[in-house]
């Protein structure tokens, strides 16, 4: 369970006025994998692309008090930087990108709680899967998602790095 003192609130769609705070959260979170020797999020995702995703309505966040505690980008189809043929199917899914929880909340199972909320929201919207990738050089992330019911769907090269594709079929535990 999450820490009972944490009030996670509801997922809120980001607006352009939220860009600075949410991008700061991404920057802060990107330092952790680098400190572990991973190349994930190095360099940090370009702010121009993130701003466009906010503008397109794909970025969401949760707040703790007045500050964002987590953010996620939910794409209705595979990211444009995936190689051709990767998840080119008709399975209705959210492609989970840049799922970030404030590092100061590590150990409180906030990410797990929010991921479960995403699963319920996706299933309630008629989607059949959550899909994501993790840089193979960051085995922590692969283990994290596998432990939460995601399946390894293979390895591909994305933006010059080997990445593991992971999928969580909804309604299956």
Locate predicted features:
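Conserved beta-strand-loop-alpha-helix junction that forms the acyl-donor binding cleft
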Residues: 106, 132-142, 158-162
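Charged catalytic carboxylate motif
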Residues: 18-21, 113-114, 140
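Terminal substrate-recognition subdomain of acyl/acetyltransferases
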Residues: 2-4, 157-173
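A short beta-loop-alpha structural element at the N-terminal edge
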Residues: 8-24
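Conserved acetyl-CoA-binding loop of GNAT-fold acetyltransferases
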Residues: 145-154
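Residues forming the Rossmann-fold NAD(P)(H) cofactor-binding site
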Residues: 108, 112
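Conserved GNAT acetyl-CoA-binding A-motif
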Residues: 115, 122-134
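Acetyl-CoA-dependent GNAT
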Residues: 16, 27-104, 115-117, 121, ...
